[in-house]
Amino acid sequence: MDYVKNIDSCRCLSLLLVVCTQSVEEFTTPVAGEYKLECWGARGGKRVNDTDAYPGNGGYSRGTKKLDINDSIYICVGQTRDDNVVLYNNRPDGISSFSGGTAGGGATSVTTKNRGELKYFSDPKYQSEVLIVAGGGGGCVWNGQGGAGGGPIGLDGKTNRSDVSPNGTGGKQQTGGITGARSGYIVSSHGKFGLGGYGYKPDVYGLYGSQGGGGWYGGGGSAYAGAAGGGSSYTDGVDNGETKKGNEKMPDPLGGDDITGNSGNGYCVISWFLE
C-alpha cells in the first residue's frame, strides 16, 4: 500500500508501506535520492491457551540510504502468530512447527540482493548486502515474558517458574542468544545469524519449548517451556542508523500515536521526497 502526502507546493513526500506477505517484496526506486528505511520486527508467538504468557514485542530500526534511480532493494517482513507454526523470517530449515511450543517473531530486513529470508545472508561475503534489520520478539510458553526484540542486544526472556528451562538470552551483534537447557531436553540450536534458537524433548519427539526471536542474530530459546530471548537489530548498512527495543517507545507504522514495541506482524516503511 502506498500513498502521497503533500508537504508544500514544490515537494511531496511519498511513502510505501510493506506488510507481511510471507515472501520477498521488491522495491525499485522511482528517483535518485535519499530514502528513509524504517523496519518493525514481529512480536513473538505464544500458545493460544497460555493466558499468562507474554511474548516479546518486536523492535524498531531506521536509517537513510542514498540510492540511484531504478535501484532495487528487497524486503522480508517478519510474521507473528499465536500457535506453534514457524514464522516467516525466523524459520529453521527442516521444521514446519514447534509442536507443544511456540515460535519467536520474525525479523524484518531490507537487503540489496534477493537471497530470500535473512538466514540466507549468513555467509560473511553476503552480510554486506544487508542494509537494516529490526529484531523480532522471543516466544513464551506457560507463563512469563519473552524478551523484546531490537536494539544492539535483544532482551532476555523472564519467567518465575523453576520447573522450566532457563530463559533464553537476547541476540547480540556478533553472536546469537543462548538457549536455556534442562536435563532430558536437547538444545537443537542457540540463536544464530537470522534465526532464533530452540530445543525439544527427544523421547517425545516434536515436544518443543519456546523459540528465540529472529534478528541480525537471533535470541536464544528455552528448550522446555519458558521464555525466549529477543533478536538483535542492525543498522550498519544505512546512514544515521537508530534502533529501539520492543519495550521502548517507537513510531506507529500505521501513522498513529507512538507505540511501546510492535505487538503484531512486522512492517517496513520506505519514504522519499519527490521534487
Task: Identify the function of each model-found stretch.
Residues 108, 133, 262-275:
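Short, structured beta-strand segments at or near domain termini in extracellular proteins/domains
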